[in-house]
């Protein structure tokens, strides 16, 4: 960005009309030798009217180039704008494997000699059952998992194997087999009560055994109420021990019953190794800290001056983040500024963690707007008041550093896919509207050059530059005496010149109706030949809000100097020798 200033030109016109009646002089008189041609012009009322300047609008003072961070919106309002991406935050929960298990249940004696004797027939009906605990476990459960409500494996087959034994000569067998699993083991094919029911015939057992396959879909602990899940201890192990009952209701017709004859079926429940793909429970994954930096470039000189102290009415830092987890993520962090590679003292601003309202990313897309007033964010944003956020930009940094630490603090159950990287993606928009508060202090330095001209032939001890100033810019401009330096052609300060500035430029109202002020800059010396060394004036102009807090800067606001006069109260001495 470049700044334009109208270079003041020192106009000292000695309109010296020396009468042409040379015939009144003796032709033999040597003017160059015998007469001192140093004369005094103007007395005490010498004044040179300079006139008026054109209206100087802010867009002439602040020239914006494409790509600069300072831009104007459609209305012409100045905004310091910056967009970019913050480093992604990643997390994952490592996979869990539940070990394979074979549970052999005690043999079920479906029929024996006594059953037939009691019936007095070769045709009987019986009902028998056995039960046992299915035991397995998982080790090395990820540290993030605090309590498990549900484990979801890849669909895992459960083989129910019935092995026939005994010496009863069967004519027919029609059996109804009911396997009742614990509600912890959710079976895809189960009916109400988590029962698996199938029929078994003599033909099914012709090879001595029969296998019926069902599928395990979930291992569910508790009743879904927080605290009723399986809490994981320091050993990071989950032990599963759940009851299974096998009931066989059989209709049997025998050809013959040998002495001591029996028919037994031995159930074996085989569950293969399970790769758990999803966990539901209380899960506290570790989320990486994210540190990023944003560079502010192409700023005008008055913003980059080390003495400038900004007081922005409502700067807004907007963050857009996608939370891929099925639970809220809380954000805490530090924003800070640095300049020329060094931290700016006092620029740190804490967010979240008690410093502000909690900053919560709900599952899915989020827009969080951090601002001084807690308002003004884009539509749909959650506005968070950060009352001290101006500290970050009070001294305008060339780099804004962002350090954020996401965390999951939920004590509610939610679901996480295992062996999957979750990425919290985040980008930002900075919008600093140039509407200032009461503590604004902008310092703008400008040098008005090439004022010397032919001043070596003119000697004067006092000069006053006076003007009437119309201002619509909502900034009050002051020029303290000590902020005016008179320089010679070598750029060195000329000593012995006293500067007195009378009046200030009052702030405009931000409307087209100007506020008018009077301004005098007086230069005076007691040392002859001093002021005529003047070649440049260096000004350090201080801008403040001037009681117009919150008014926005627009590129159409303007300032105009009228009735400009250069007064030389004691006249000038012109050397015509």
Regions found by a protein language model. Give the residues of each.
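Bacterial N-terminal signal peptides that target proteins for export
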Residues: 2-11
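Extracellular/secretory-pathway and virion-surface proteins
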Residues: 24-577
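C-terminal motif of bacterial Sec signal peptides marking the signal peptidase cleavage site
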Residues: 19-23
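Short, well-ordered helical secondary-structure segments
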Residues: 11-12, 553
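Hydrophobic helical h-region of N-terminal Sec-dependent signal peptides
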Residues: 12-18
